[in-house]
Amino acid sequence: MAKSSRENGPREPAAGGSLSGTRESLAQGPDAATADELSSLGSDSEANGFAERRIDKFGFIVGSQGAEGALEEVPLEVLRQRESKWLDMLNNWDKWMAKKHKKIRLRCQKGIPPSLRGRAWQYLSGGKVKLQQNPGKFDELDMSPGDPKWLDVIERDLHRQFPFHEMFVSRGGHGQQDLFRVLKAYTLYRPEEGYCQAQAPIAAVLLMHMPAEQAFWCLVQVCEKYLPGYYSEKLEAIQLDGEILFSLLQKVSPVAHKHLSRQKIDPLLYMTEWFMCAFARTLPWSSVLRVWDMFFCEGVKIIFRVGLVLLKHALGSPEKLKACQGQYETIEQLRSLSPKIMQEAFLVQEVIELPVTERQIEREHLIQLRRWQETRGELECRSLPRMHGAKAILDAEPGPRPALQPSPSIRLPPDAALLSSKAKPHKQAQKEQKRTKTSAQLDKSPGLSQATVVTAAGDACPPQGVSPKDPVPQDPTPQNLACHHSQESLTSQESEDTYL
């Protein structure tokens, strides 16, 4: 990888030509010019001054390009209801994924509570299972020296990742250190793939929500399951998806498709950073998080939908095309998108309503792959098949996998915990009494049918294959108690979903 190519930006193809994509051509973000200037803000000598800066709810310095203005706050009671429902799902994840996956998808579309977002991403992506299947693997990779040809490139990229965020503002700070560890570990885990610059913002977003080891396994899942081949040497997968996006655009917005065709603008010029960074360097931060919530649940179709929505609203009407008379003006229009179309509520609603399915994407993928093979030959990168979301990843998991062991998240007051512990012996005594009564009936009635015995013992012993309900994890620390006092039950048959 040419280390200086990032500063030069992407090369525009000649009219009618095609762009031979390489991962060195990833465009530099709009804030990269000021990243070098701001990277010294967090030096050790200025650490004391950092506390005086105002930080927004997402961790960005107020007034910086990453920070957002006034946001619509979710009422506290609504947030507590959301947390309670998500805690129930996470603590019974396998059951929910098996029987109520549509409900999980609906709640991901409505937004994961911030306090549980990192944990939910781990469960949705399968990163939690990968971690349990590979205990100590990250530590082993972390202790290894790494390949020198990648280490220097990674180190040069560290200060470019969200330099206005409190985690990454300091050179050599804990955020940059963890980012280096995660990216280095991936080059050792997949030495044939190495490092691509677009992996850095993906890993940085993950580190904002979880520790380094968990972020590493989520990154593995993104690279291998959600976006396989995106970060390979020749960027063949991203080129194919560019053609898929352009073909789908013809159905979603014929006006935008016709304009881009007339201008002979290669899809790689506007969608490379969108797709490879999962819009982490494009959208306002609140929109990024909502898009990622849906992406981890539903897969790459969310990335396609977001791209199509942006193209449709940026170039989808004659009025908007008046200012786009040439290639340069069109590219600038797509690089400086209107804040309205990127606003969280508007964008998410448009993405949910856009009728683009996995089947359409896969059908178009086969068409574009056939064209590629006819004109360019076989793909050099043999990546794994793409998994369309959390359910597909779970279903494709080979053989028996370890049951997810949720960390205790439900907190009960000390009195409630004491009552719960006192109630257990009483319930066990009742069960023993029922078993004794059933045995006595058998002794007195030798002709009692087997069906009658099963019916009589049904209350005492659950049927085969149905496990008794797990006890609620207990923690004597009475913190955040109000989050778990909701009278609603996720296992009940609700007439309508009260999750707002």
Curated annotation (Swiss-Prot):
Which portions of the sequence form the region Disordered?
Answer: 1-45, 396-415, 420-500
Phosphothreonine sites (modified residues): T477
Residue numbers for the site described as Arginine finger?
R156
Identify the Gene3D superfamilies for this entry.
putative rabgap domain of human tbc1 domain family member 14 like domains, Ypt/Rab-GAP domain of gyp1p, domain 1, Ypt/Rab-GAP domain of gyp1p, domain 3
For the site labelled Glutamine finger, the residues are: Q197
Which PROSITE patterns does the UniProt entry name for this protein? TBC_RABGAP
Extract the Pfam families matched here. Answer: RabGAP-TBC
Basic and acidic residues: compositionally biased ranges: 1-10
Where is it chiefly localized? Answer: other
> Which GO terms of the cellular component aspect does the record hold?
cytosol; microvillus; plasma membrane
Compositionally skewed regions (Polar residues) per UniProt: 438-453
Q: Name one GO biological process term.
A: positive regulation of proteolysis
Q: Where, subcellularly, is it found?
A: Cell projection, Microvillus
Q: Which residues form the Rab-GAP TBC domain?
A: 111-299
Key words of the record: Cell projection, GTPase activation, Guanine-nucleotide releasing factor, Phosphoprotein
- Is Lipid metabolism one of the keywords UniProt gives this record? no
Q: How does it assemble?
A: Binds to the first PDZ domain of NHERF1 and NHERF2.
What domain comment accompanies this record?
Answer: The arginine and glutamine fingers are critical for the GTPase-activating mechanism, they pull out Rab's 'switch 2' glutamine and insert in Rab's active site.
Report the protein's function: GTPase-activating protein (GAP) specific for RAB27A and RAB35. Does not show GAP activity for RAB2A, RAB3A and RAB4A.
This protein's name: TBC1 domain family member 10A
| Species of origin | Mus musculus (Mouse)
